[in-house]
Design a protein with these regions (language model features):
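Solvent-exposed soluble domains appended to multi-pass membrane proteins
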Residues: 1-205
């Protein structure tokens, strides 16, 4: 990430310490925690002592740095999740891993066309949506947008009568339209009407 920010490994270790000390999420209490990582932000530069993988010179430097940083952040998240699994309250806990935007941003077009990145780097802007300890085990391969995450989580939490159900559609809804609007107002997917597109773009803004 950018300079002078707490690394994800240190960040999650500090979060774990606060839970262990009872400063946050005490046993027997319900809690909502939102933990925001930063190491995986451009320009994707990690100190040498934190780099656990390396790539040949065939891989563009920016692409290699991105994957090295992704490895670091993934490991930090993984260690924290494994810790959460040891807690008594884990059985009633939903862990959601997502992002506010896709990773490569302005680097994507360049890497898509590079000899080392072509065929590896997608020209699509993907953002992860991973639910750990979900009451429903599934993999969703169709198109969905960030707007669809909130109503999906309401479904998983069985909050179908919640006072605000969001602007998107739950992926558990068999009638969900398989499309999404990107940050550049580009539309991905199919099976939607002009009215659906207009609504999604308005909701994005």
């Amino acid at each position: 990430g950018t300079h002078k920010r707490t690394g994800d490994g240190s960040f999650f270790a500090q979060c774990q310490e606060k839970i262990e000390k009872g400063e946050i999420w005490k046993e027997g209490e319900n809690a909502y925690m939102q933990l925001i990582t930063y190491s995986g932000h451009a320009p994707f530069i990690l100190p040498e002592y934190l780099r656990e993988i390396s790539f040949s010179s065939d891989i563009p430097e920016k692409m290699g740095n991105y994957m090295i940083t992704a490895r670091y952040t993934d490991k930090a998240i993984g260690k924290f999740v494994e810790y959460l699994k040891t807690l008594p309250q884990y059985k009633e806990t939903l862990i959601v891993i997502t992002g506010d935007h896709e990773g490569l941003a302005s680097y994507r077009a360049e890497l898509c066309e590079s000899p080392g990145g072509k065929g590896i780097v997608s020209d699509k802007q993907f953002t992860p949506f991973i639910v750990v300890n979900s009451p429903i085990g599934m993999r969703y391969d169709e198109v969905m947008g960030q707007i669809d995450m909130y109503p999906t989580l309401l479904n998983l939490l069985q909050l179908d009568d919640y006072y605000w159900t969001g602007l998107g559609e739950s992926i558990l809804n068999p009638e969900k339209k398989e499309f999404a609007v990107g940050s550049q107002m580009n539309v991905e997917g199919e099976g939607y009407s002009p009215e659906d597109e207009d609504f999604a773009k308005e909701a994005y803004n």
